[in-house]
Amino acid sequence: MFDFDATLPFMALQFLLLAAVLNAIFYKPLTKVLDDRDSYIRTNTLEARESLAKAERLATEYEQQLADARRQSQATVEAAQLEAKKITAEKIAEAQKEAQSQREQASVEIEQQKQQAFSTLEQQVDALSRQILEKLLGPTPVR
């Protein structure tokens, strides 16, 4: 069946030589390329994870800053509204005070005019009364 002559060791030597040549020419560069590719993928994956973590951290930080800015703007708006209400209340109080002052002044003027009108009417009544008496009684002799 099998002949064990020089062909078998020669074929074994040829197989080993082919395996060594293929290993040197094909498998080592292929393994190196695969290792480099694996290293590149791992590096990129790690960098991507770091970038994603950094982006998430920045997004959280920006959201916090945005929330702080909203709170500050809300506080500013509320402070402005309170200030506006305070100013409005002061202006209303001032206007009411001025209106009250004008009412009091008008009341005083009306009272003065009333007294003046009564005084004028009294003088006219006295004068008319004397005229009526003179017409009724006649002229009175001067003493």
From Swiss-Prot:
InterPro entries: ATP_synth_b, ATP_synth_B-like_membr_sf, ATP_synth_b/b'su_bac/chlpt, ATP_synthase_B_chain. One of its GO terms (cellular component) is plasma membrane-derived thylakoid membrane. One of its GO terms (molecular function) is proton-transporting ATPase activity, rotational mechanism. Its main location: membrane. The chain crosses the membrane at residues 6-26. Belongs to the ATPase B chain family. NCBIfam families: PRK07353.1. F(1)F(0) ATP synthase produces ATP from ADP in the presence of a proton or sodium gradient. F-type ATPases consist of two structural domains, F(1) containing the extramembraneous catalytic core and F(0) containing the membrane proton channel, linked together by a central stalk and a peripheral stalk. During catalysis, ATP synthesis in the catalytic domain of F(1) is coupled via a rotary mechanism of the central stalk subunits to proton translocation. F-type ATPases have 2 components, F(1) - the catalytic core - and F(0) - the membrane proton channel. F(1) has five subunits: alpha(3), beta(3), gamma(1), delta(1), epsilon(1). F(0) has four main subunits: a(1), b(1), b'(1) and c(10-14). The alpha and beta chains form an alternating ring which encloses part of the gamma chain. F(1) is attached to F(0) by a central stalk formed by the gamma and epsilon chains, while a peripheral stalk is formed by the delta, b and b' chains. This is ATP synthase subunit b'. It comes from Nostoc punctiforme (strain ATCC 29133 / PCC 73102).
